[in-house]
Amino acid sequence: MEERLVSGEVLGEETALEPSLRPQYLHEYIGQDKIKENLKVFIEAAKLREETLDHVLLYGPPGLGKTTLAVIIANEMGVKLRATSGPALERPGDLAALLTSLEPGDVLFIDEIHRLPRAVEEVLYPAMEDYCLDITIGKGPDARTLRLDLPPFTLVGATTRAGALSAPLRDRFGVISRLEYYHVDQLAQIIERAAAILQIGIEREAALELARRARGTPRIANRLLRRVRDFAQVRGEGGITLPLAVEALERLQVDRLGLDQIDHKLLSAMIEKFAGGPVGLETLAAVIGEEAQTIEEVYEPYLMQIGLLQRTPRGRVVTPAAYTHLGMEVPKR
């Protein structure tokens, strides 16, 4: 799958750049107001009691700020953050080494926690519940279990697929929060903040235009800002104006709803080859040359969210709004 400008996932170039745009404390964090207010209370209460914060599970679509909140939690608690990911912890020993290196109060952040192997996940249970680590020494009838005490710590888990978490793991989190897509005005504020950090001027209307095409996702908003900044700087203009933003986004092939070429290809194929549907997932995948899982997990969610596509028992169906958006006549059914 090619890298998409409107993908919520981290693209290669962004690994080093994202931290520079990331807010460090709750008062700098824009959006997710309910989560933010609750975390403020939980953090203040933990500090008053001189205890570690309860384990936190953050879930929601990619690019909404789960990693940023983990950084903020550590900063607000005044402790170190140790970050890893589910796929990186292949064996129980990998997690054991990480847990035994923690200092009291540390925040351990595990991204994509739903991808932890079951054997590794089981090591987490006593670590989360009793701050201890059970190590098996030897094999067979002579095997014995050695229990090691761990310093108190806070686990922050992040996932895009909360339903894929096992019940025993999910139940051990004291704080569970779902991150929602952002409103346009919130994204515009995020864009203006990032523009100030990147030292590029941007008109309010231009920030709003970028926000409208960012699919409710801060990561996409910041990515669009950086690409439009390229156009502004190459042209020698002092900042990003609305006309420049619109022209740049059109050249980047991101339309006014945030759809790109692949979205248009999917919708057009359904309309032109299947009269708008219903069409089966496997058939659609074969026609547009993409894997069925990629269509279901990457492309469809946003199209359904904005009302251009529906899943029905008989298959996928394009809505009248999709015809209108693509400039096609809505068929009479």
Curated annotation (Swiss-Prot):
Main location per the UniProt record: cytoplasm
Binding site for Mg(2+): 67
Family per similarity comment: Belongs to the RuvB family.
Residue segments, region Large ATPase domain (RuvB-L): 1-182
Keyword terms, alphabetized: ATP-binding, Cytoplasm, DNA damage, DNA recombination, DNA repair, DNA-binding, Hydrolase, Nucleotide-binding
Gene Ontology biological process terms from the UniProt entry: DNA recombination; DNA repair
GO cellular component: cytoplasm; Holliday junction resolvase complex
Enzyme Commission code(s) on record: 3.6.4.-
CDD domains named in the record: AAA
Protein name according to UniProt: Holliday junction branch migration complex subunit RuvB
Naturally occurring in which organism (per UniProt): Geobacillus kaustophilus (strain HTA426)
Entry function: The RuvA-RuvB-RuvC complex processes Holliday junction (HJ) DNA during genetic recombination and DNA repair, while the RuvA-RuvB complex plays an important role in the rescue of blocked DNA replication forks via replication fork reversal (RFR). RuvA specifically binds to HJ cruciform DNA, conferring on it an open structure. The RuvB hexamer acts as an ATP-dependent pump, pulling dsDNA into and through the RuvAB complex. RuvB forms 2 homohexamers on either side of HJ DNA bound by 1 or 2 RuvA tetramers; 4 subunits per hexamer contact DNA at a time.
